[in-house]
Amino acid sequence: MKYTTQMDAARKGIITKEMEIVSKKENMDIEILREKMAKGQIVIPANKNHKSLDPEGIGSGLKTKINVNLGISRDCPNVDAELEKVKIAIDMKAEAIMDLSSFGKTEEFRQKLVNMSTAMIGTVPIYDAVGFYDKELKDITEKEFLDVVRKHGEDGVDFVTIHAGLNRDTVKTFKKNTRVTNIVSRGGSLLYAWMELNNKENPFYEYYDELLEICAAYDMTISLGDALRPGSIADGTDASQIAELMVLGELTKRAWEKNVQVIIEGPGHMKLNEIEANVILEKKLCHGAPFYVLGPLVTDIAPGYDHITSAIGGAIAASHGVDFLCYVTPAEHLRLPTLEDMKEGIIASKIAAHAGDLAKGVQGADEWDLKMSKARQKLDWEEMFSLSIDDEKARRYRKESSPEHEDSCTMCGKMCSMRNMNRIMEGKDINILRSED
């Protein structure tokens, strides 16, 4: 039996090779996986033209996944540096990479990225439109916007962020409700500008059915972008954000009618106590579609440390049911991330994702922690290093500050609780003052 997309296959009772791979990775019964995909609760972004892809699932009951942003900008157009970031992201087991290139002809970089990446690839096609056509934003036509999306599909992109929820109605809500930081979504701000300059409806909303046909043709997952996400604590969970979310819920149903897989994008900046409510709202208004959040950042005061503000919010969000975290680096709000910034961002996001998985009871999530605890109890340093989320850093710290005795560290020395409890439990003496046992 033939199928067009992963969702179409799931609804027809067909088990695809991508489903088989995800089922084994997640230790989820394949029929449960298929049923959730048929309902839109799980997606497997897998463009038919992405031949090097090692597929991953995103959604209900699965491990929380992370995405790494990279790409070329006008001020930092170094392609080789960005390709090095791709290699690091893959080595560090990020499940997704988004090419957010915003300068020049990005096609060659995007094609290299797809060809070399086992991780799923996402893009924001509107970023590419100005460079692709070599036109000012206001001069790009509705058809040209759609053609850029088609080009990304041809190139093998697995999921595309489309800010289709920013329409004339949500713009009215935005204009009525004063914000501190207006529209902070780059794609959202470009679309808003295009709409205002041309006095027209958002082309991705007006021609949404045509957009869905493009996505279905390549089995591109549509990541419905939140153009009106809050960019400051003051704007969190405001009328504009929720108005757009309601539209995204309607667009989700329309995509599912065409068997197009959907991810919903979310905040952004918000207070800790608002995170759970935002997850509940998304799951309710968007009918259980997987939720993909940028952070959320839980305070605005920490430039240089936003990988921490994001990890705090990300862990809480994941614990309440968020399915996909976009990493944030220490460079957020300051500059294009360096390789080191990127590494720190990936690790912070992976910690947040795993902490969330522990809290929401993802199958097998606690096995990693149990192995680490047992290694600590045995003072098996090599095992601890091998289990560390960043084994290189753990080894380096141990090497830089070596203890007198191997069965301790320089924090506690011979007062190490693990060391002394092991000895007492084995019926041995505890020696703290003497230099030798």
UniProtKB/Swiss-Prot annotation:
Catalysed reactions, semicolon-separated: 5-amino-1-(5-phospho-beta-D-ribosyl)imidazole + S-adenosyl-L-methionine = 4-amino-2-methyl-5-(phosphooxymethyl)pyrimidine + CO + 5'-deoxyadenosine + formate + L-methionine + 3 H(+)
Cofactor: how and how many bound: Binds 1 [4Fe-4S] cluster per subunit. The cluster is coordinated with 3 cysteines and an exchangeable S-adenosyl-L-methionine.
Pfam families referenced in this protein's UniProt entry, alphabetically: ThiC_Rad_SAM (PF01964)
Binding residue positions for Zn(2+): 269, 333
Top-rank lineage group of the source organism: Bacteria
Keyword NADP: no
Record-listed E.C. numbers: 4.1.99.17
GO molecular function per UniProt: 4 iron, 4 sulfur cluster binding; carbon-carbon lyase activity; zinc ion binding
Gene3D superfamilies for this protein: 6.10.250.620, Radical SAM ThiC family, central domain
Principal EC category: lyase
Associated pathway: Cofactor biosynthesis; thiamine diphosphate biosynthesis
Binding of [4Fe-4S] cluster, residues: 409, 412, 416
An example Gene Ontology CC term for this record: cytosol
Keyword field: 4Fe-4S, Iron, Iron-sulfur, Lyase, Metal-binding, S-adenosyl-L-methionine, Thiamine biosynthesis, Zinc
Chain sites annotated for binding substrate: 69, 98, 127, 163, 185-187, 226-229, 265, 292
GO biological process: thiamine biosynthetic process; thiamine diphosphate biosynthetic process
Cofactor(s) annotated in UniProt: [4Fe-4S] cluster
Function: Catalyzes the synthesis of the hydroxymethylpyrimidine phosphate (HMP-P) moiety of thiamine from aminoimidazole ribotide (AIR) in a radical S-adenosyl-L-methionine (SAM)-dependent reaction.
Family statement: Belongs to the ThiC family.
Name of protein: Phosphomethylpyrimidine synthase
Organism expressing this protein natively: Alkaliphilus oremlandii (strain OhILAs) (Clostridium oremlandii (strain OhILAs))
Biological classification of the source: Bacteria, Bacillati, Bacillota, Clostridia, Peptostreptococcales
